């Protein structure tokens, strides 16, 4: 047992042989302090969105390492509205920033966004057929002015690069290129 963890080990073992340990703010702080000399930033993980715990963690780490960067997982596993008011949610990240949490992230945000949007598209496609997809495509076109670039999916995934690579390897004789002459290239304007 690592000496830094010893006071948190309960003494029991799991059926797999792992020691059971106390999951607490104190154990998180002790672990953070142990890693602080070696880590670029220290990640705080709480079981609910809890500014009091985040503050206690920050104060303990920064008391010994005042310039240490902190990270906080604004977890999608939290039921945010069940735990915080709209006002508290709106100020949550600013409060974290004031405590020194410079890297704030949502693990799996893309997973949730992708799955929810695909669910909506499938539901709408069932009832409105192609009109549902065209609505999505028009939203993509509208988002291009804000930097969205995935409307042209072949270009987005690097098809042009692999076409050039294939041509270089084959001495310009490959019939496997995908982007040149494609429907995407023909129908989507390059601005």
Question: What residues fall within each predicted segment?
Answer:
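Alpha/beta enzyme core
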Residues: 1-72, 76-78, 82-105, 119, ...
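Short acidic/histidine-rich active-site segments
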Residues: 106-111
């Amino acid at each position: 047992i690592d000496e830094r963890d010893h006071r948190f080990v309960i003494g029991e073992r799991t059926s797999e042989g792992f020691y059971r340990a106390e999951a607490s703010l104190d154990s998180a702080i002790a672990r953070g302090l142990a890693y602080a000399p070696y880590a670029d930033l220290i990640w705080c993980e709480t079981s609910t969105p809890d500014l009091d715990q985040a503050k206690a963690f920050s104060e303990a780490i920064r008391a010994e390492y005042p310039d240490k960067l902190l990270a906080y997982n604004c977890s999608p596993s939290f039921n945010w509205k069940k735990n915080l008011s709209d006002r508290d949610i709106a100020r949550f990240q600013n409060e974290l920033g004031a405590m020194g949490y410079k890297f704030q992230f949502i693990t799996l945000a893309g997973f949730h966004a992708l799955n929810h949007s695909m669910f909506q598209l499938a539901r709408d496609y069932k009832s409105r057929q192609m009109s549902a997809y065209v609505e999505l495509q028009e939203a993509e076109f509208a988002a291009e002015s804000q930097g969205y670039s995935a409307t042209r999916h072949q270009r987005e995934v690097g098809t042009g690069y692999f076409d050039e690579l294939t041509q270089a390897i084959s001495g310009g004789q490959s019939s496997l290129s995908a982007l040149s002459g494609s429907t995407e290239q023909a129908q989507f304007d390059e601005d």
